[in-house]
Amino acid sequence: MRKMILILLVLVAAGLLTKYVITKIHRFYTLDDLQTSWPQQVLGVYNRSTNSIIFNNDSVLHYTLNWVNNAEKSLPEKSIKLLIEQKLPIFFNLQIWSGKLISKLDKPVLNAIVTGDFDTKLIAFFKLLDKSKTTIYLRCNAEMEMPLYNKYPWQNQGATLYIISFRHVALLCKKYSPSVKIVWGPSGYPGSEEYWPGNEYVDINSVNIDTAKEIKNDPYPSYSSVEEMTRLKLFRMRFMNKPVYFLSSASVTRASFKNQWLNELNNKLIADKNIYQSTIIPFESDTTAIKKIRDTNLEIGVYDPRLKLINQPLITIEHIFTDMKSVENGLFKKQFNAVIDRKHDVIVTIEPWKDNSKERDSAILNNTVLGKYDKIWSKLYQEISNIPQTVYLRWGHEMEIPVDRYPWQKQDPVSYIKAFRYFATFQKATNIKIVWGPAGDRGSVEWWPGEDVVDFVSIAIYGLPDKNINDYNKQQSFTSIFQNKFHRLRFAHRPIFITEFGVKGPEDYKMKWLKDAAETINKYPEIKGVCYFNFADTPKAWGNAETPDWSITPLTFKSFTALLNDLPKTNAQ
């Protein structure tokens, strides 16, 4: 063994081994790897107080410190001491690679951090940094949100576990080295917001300008240029009241990055200031920002075009899907009046197109802002206003899903927000509640239009996770789906209305799934109402897969509603 290691060390000295093998040797000796060359350097800084970006000309020393176990003795203490004696600011990129624990069983690295297995080493490191007389920036376990990259062991571990581990490290750092600037370092990929650890644990945000990784992961929305990438990454950081550092990469170096790109982005920031930086965005949002509303009765409803369930006594609301053509030709008014005659409240999902099979207006968002459909919106608002019933008006739903089902999908989030705000403020009556309706998928909060134009957030919960799964036994539980979507929407700061939900399978399986749903609904006072989708999904919406039928029997629905708390008193009597 000693002979083999000596041979490897000779090869390393000769430069004949890759960095991968070098890392393996370090791991065998339980030594940490301090890299003095790092491609990620600060290109520019976004200042939220001035809503502007400046190009960074400051000299900052960048180092990556790779930890391969939790042994304090493996810290390169002498090297770190020499570094922090320098006058220039230092940016440490700490990567805790391994859950290899001395005298203990190995465990996943984030779990090892949370359970304190790295505490002794972390404290020793922070005590070293506390002796520095220069500014120290510390970024730990970055790029956590990249879904397909799989380079680091802290990726694809779940947002909650990552947040807990980040907070653990941050609290130790603040205790033993309070002057260190803690950097939260997502790549800036869609869904970054899910991993936000909280305002009090972070001093600075950073995002990577890296075309190679983004293209590999097929980001949505897609990027047409480095400038576009930079803009969207900054847009995803708009909920956090922190400066944003743009970091270079091997594919976008400091030498290749142009100041002009930042200047152009500055112009866009000024033009769209009310979207990028708004006083109504709850910057301090953490994990419990969604408002609780269950001081009133739970709304119970159905989408039930075959009229199988609508006469059940606990139902207070019905769901109508409509489009611009139906508003124009009077079909919507007929459907709407039928619900009003039944004394039910109404969810109106308005799909901003005229013919979902022939006419697809790819410029639907821009045309909305330009006023092309004003006559239609005026007619719609006139028909639903000033009536005793509450109307929950939901426009352009499921905008964040990267498919071609609707022409308002796969669009720039800023364009969507402008169109949504135009529609939401077009006209308002006291009986109308504006509903923002994402599916609740990854990155959905990017399309958040602002709480000044939204009364409720709606989500859809269906058991089948995607169109490639037809086995009803492989469906996800209502609870697991809801908890993921609830977490993603924590920045929205509005109560939840589950305007669509459904399950596939035999009736006994459906009842079991719905029992779990009732338990979760009862636990969350943030949920204003629920509406079951009692019909088959849209034909061909699932591609070549069999279209799922979510329909349930009246007995199953009655059994489900009997499990709910805060039932409507008037209808239940």
State what each model feature region is.
Residues 44-51, 72-81, 122-125, 186-200, ...:
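Alpha-helical scaffolding within the catalytic cores
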Residues 42, 59-62, 87-91, 135-139, ...:
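Structural preference for beta-strand elements that scaffold enzyme active sites
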Residues 78-95, 195, 200, 210-254, ...:
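Glycoside hydrolase catalytic-domain groove-lining segments
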Residues 73-180, 334-433:
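Substrate-binding cleft of extracellular glycoside hydrolase catalytic domains
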Residues 25-120, 206, 251, 277-280, ...:
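N-terminal substrate-binding region of glycoside hydrolase catalytic domains
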